[in-house]
């Protein structure tokens, strides 16, 4: 799998990335939710950019799709 780096600054942008990777994987939301062990409403909310998503579940979904979430702390360079 090739990787590309994408910066995000909102829950909405993260949801868009999750949706794009899910679709690239050829999965329906229902199948992806089962694969990630989350509910269909949760995955739908994440993809819609709802700010109420639980970070643990968000990270689980990202991890399952190979989305590496990184933090850039102040003072660090790229």
Residue ranges and their predicted role:
Residues 12, 22-23:
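Short amphipathic helical patch at the helix-1/turn junction of helix-turn-helix
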